[in-house]
Amino acid sequence: MAHTEQKVWCNYVKKKRPEFFKNVHVCDIGSLDINGNNRYLFEGYKYIGVDIYPGRNVDVISRGHAFTPLIEFDVVISSECFEHDEFYTYTLQNIVRTLLRPGGMFIFTCATDGRHEHGTRRTSPADSPATQDYYMNISEHDVRTALNIEAEFDEWEFDVNHRTHDLYFYGIKK
């Protein structure tokens, strides 16, 4: 969780769909706590934090596209991760096809068009300690290229914060 606007989006979704934030199994992709995490959103949860780098809020060290637990999750959440994941298309597909149960919710935030590169050796390496050689802003078009949103989700919403250059999404899997 990198800035206030992301919290506003997550709290908007929580208010809209509160049943996904209490007594649920949660998987957080890109969970390393660099400047906050997503646990505060949930009550009475079972939570697994997945990241490629060990540290606070990380339970399993794995790439998002390679993580294949034996259970499906009620909620998969990811904040400010996909722009640092060179395999983000495969990660998105793994989340929807493997990690998320039917009827479960996927929620994410990521950098989109206009955001300055961050978390690389050229910019601010501490912002993404394990992926300093890759960065790409992700657009709604990129997500729709990776996933057939209409076929995968019964309900969904994209939003863009043009001031912070964030892409926001939540969807309820069919």
Language model features: what each stretch is:
Residues 1-71, 75, 133-136, 140-147, ...:
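Conserved N-terminal segment of class I S-adenosyl-L-methionine
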Residues 2, 81-84:
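Short beta->alpha junction loops/turns
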Residues 28, 78, 108:
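Redox-cofactor binding/interface segments in oxidoreductases and associated redox assembly factors
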Residues 47, 83, 101:
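A short glycine-/small-residue-rich loop at the edge of a beta-strand within enzyme catalytic domains
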Residues 66, 83, 115:
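Active-site micro-motifs of SAM-dependent methyltransferase domains
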Residues 75-81:
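A short beta-strand submotif of the Rossmann-like class I SAM-dependent methyltransferase core
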Residues 86-101, 105-174:
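S-adenosyl-L-methionine-dependent methyltransferase catalytic module, highlighting the catalytic core
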